[in-house]
Each structure stands twice: as structure tokens, then as C-alpha cells.
């Protein structure tokens, strides 16, 4: 990296960190955050994400701040390790991408769910789908993942508060089609690249939530 590029990156970092630590940003975050999240912690996590993903330093400051505030409004953690939500650079804009754990969190808040299970299906698993009177899934796996083979699909299975149940299954080809529609899916720092299984789970959860008319 050339000297002037280093200086420019350092300047962006200083400006963004100053914004995140400013009284105006902290006040705004306190206005939108739920009680279980603290503005200072969110700012600290955002700064850590900037250090871990320097491409974020090239994003427009307003788009970055907007993505952080949006995550706060949703009550989602932006720590990429936790998988609730991700800050993803695309060109010079920062996008907020909700992970499957974040999608589950939003769905659970609806009050319509008792629980939701999300699993990958591998080629050597004993897996069956039944519709009609015996509507449901049957999924048995081998104890060692090395014996299960390659991933062939994913499912989300919801137990509803009204006593009902509903599931959605997507094979790997369907997941890949959804991935291809994401503008930043092939970027090296996209969660589709760094957390592919989590993003696939998020995709099937999101589709099921649409059928259930839940908030995600």
C-alpha cells in the first residue's frame, strides 16, 4: 500500500471513530436501543469491526452510521462472530446484513413461535419430507460429521404458539440462486464467503418467516 493510501485510510479511521465516540452518536443510539444494549458497547464493537475489516473504512460515513443505528433499532448485535448481523461494505456504501441468529431473534419477538429449529441436511443423512396427513420432517444423522457427506440442503422447522407446526426446506441449488442475487456475495468479506452455512440458514428461516407473516 502506498504512503498516501495509508494516510487516507488512517484519516478515514480517525474520522469514523470520532463520529462513533461523539456525544451526538451516543445520544442517538440511546434513543433507539432496547434496554439490553448499551450505546458505548455498540460503538466499541463497531470500531472492532472496522479494524477487522478495513474495507469498511472506505464506506461513506453516513451509510456506516446508518447501518449501525438500524441494527440498534432492531436490537441486533453487530459482532460478526455472533452471527446476528453484519456490517458489509459494497462499493462505497455499508450494508447491514441480518444473519440467521438475528432472523431467529426477530421471529421469536413476534410471540407467534414457541421454538424454531434450523439444520443443514447432508447427503448421507436419513432425511424425509412428508406432506398431507403426516405433514412433517424426519431427520436422523450419523454421529460423526465426516460420515455425513456434503451439504445438500437446509430446513427451518417452527413450533407455533397456537399448537401448529410449519417447516420450509431449500436444497443447495435454491440457496445458490438466492446467493447469486446478493450484490456483494462474491466479495471476500461478504458473510456469504466467511459464514456460508449461517447465511444459508438465514435464507431458509427468512422464507419460512414470510409464510408465517412474521416480522423478518
Residue ranges and their predicted role:
Residues 8-215:
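Binding-interface segments
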Amino acid at each position: 500500500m502506498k504512503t498516501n493510501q495509508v494516510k487516507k485510510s488512517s484519516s478515514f479511521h480517525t474520522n469514523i471513530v470520532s463520529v462513533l465516540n461523539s456525544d451526538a452518536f451516543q445520544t442517538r443510539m440511546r434513543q433507539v436501543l432496547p434496554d439490553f444494549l448499551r450505546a458505548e458497547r455498540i460503538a466499541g464493537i463497531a470500531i472492532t469491526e472496522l479494524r477487522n475489516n478495513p474495507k469498511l473504512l472506505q464506506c461513506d460515513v453516513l451509510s456506516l452510521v446508518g447501518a449501525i443505528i438500524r441494527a440498534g433499532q432492531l436490537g441486533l448485535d453487530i459482532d460478526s462472530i455472533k452471527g446476528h448481523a453484519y456490517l458489509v461494505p459494497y462499493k462505497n456504501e455499508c450494508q447491514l446484513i441480518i444473519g440467521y441468529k438475528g432472523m431467529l431473534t426477530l421471529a421469536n419477538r413476534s410471540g407467534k413461535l414457541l421454538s424454531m429449529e434450523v439444520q443443514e441436511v447432508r447427503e448421507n443423512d436419513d432425511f424425509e419430507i412428508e406432506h398431507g396427513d403426516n405433514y412433517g420432517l424426519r431427520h436422523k444423522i450419523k454421529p460423526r460429521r465426516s460420515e455425513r457427506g456434503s451439504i445438500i440442503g437446509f430446513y427451518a422447522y417452527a413450533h407455533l404458539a397456537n399448537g401448529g407446526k410449519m417447516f420450509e426446506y431449500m436444497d443447495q441449488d435454491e440457496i445458490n440462486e438466492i446467493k447469486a442475487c446478493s450484490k456483494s456475495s462474491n466479495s471476500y468479506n461478504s458473510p456469504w464467503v466467511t459464514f456460508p452455512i449461517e447465511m444459508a440458514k438465514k435464507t431458509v428461516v427468512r422464507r419460512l418467516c414470510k409464510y408465517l407473516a412474521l416480522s423478518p
